[in-house]
Amino acid sequence: MKKRKIRYDRILLPILILCVIIFGISSCHKTEETKIQSKPIHTTTDFLKNALKPVGQTLYIYGGGWNEAQTGSGTEALTLGLSKEWKSFYDTQDNTYNYENYMYEIHKGLDCSGYVGWTIYNTLETKSKHGNGYVLKAEEMTKTFANMKLGSYKDSIQNAKPGDIVSMANAHVYIVLAVCEDGSLLIAHSSPPGVKISGTYDQNGNSNSQAVLYAKKIMKTYYPDWYSRYPDCTVDSR
């Protein structure tokens, strides 16, 4: 069987950048997906650095990042820096964690839109408790952010780039970290069990994609405790 040639020069650069970001210093199909391209008010690197801060230590909480009424940003999503309660709650759990046992315990972790909203707040704002924040329904994020002049809106994920925010029709939202040659995306998102790096299927619908392999390497290397509990790094974005 003929092996697929991988353009490592195109894939390893964003992965290298990602590894640098992880250490705190600074391209790897879905209908009805939309994205918002990052606007360079603050650099994409700033945005991705913030996106990685909760990774591997923040569990998925349905409603996490929202206020008590579930109408917008909660305290954590209006605060600069990580909430100490996220890591504390993570430390009390193990590989049997089930988010359904902690629904709406909003201070313990983040859901997908709470995570993206927190990341944007920590990138754009300079002080806590300023304004209304950026948490809203996942499927509405891309259009709303474009209307807020935070980026441009497209109704397709073709030509995705690192820093893009992608809203999915199934009420999920994620941040693109890198684009792989097989069409798969390396992403950061909050999805059960929590905030993690994952890889999407490739353009042919295969789950063993380049992005999935890179996600596993990154999580295993830089977040070993998380990976020992939650080794699944695959997300079906079709």
What are the roles of these predicted feature ranges?
Residues 29-31:
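Bacterial signal peptide processing site
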Residues 202-238:
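Low-complexity, Gly/Ser/Thr/Pro-rich intrinsically disordered linker/tail segments
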Residues 2-14:
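N-terminal Sec-pathway targeting helices
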Residues 14-22:
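Hydrophobic membrane-insertion alpha-helices, especially the h-region
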Residues 24-27:
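C-terminal motif of bacterial Sec signal peptides marking the signal peptidase cleavage site
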Residues 33-125:
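N-terminal capping segments
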Residues 125-199:
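...with weaker cross-activation on analogous glycine-rich loops/strands in unrelated enzymes
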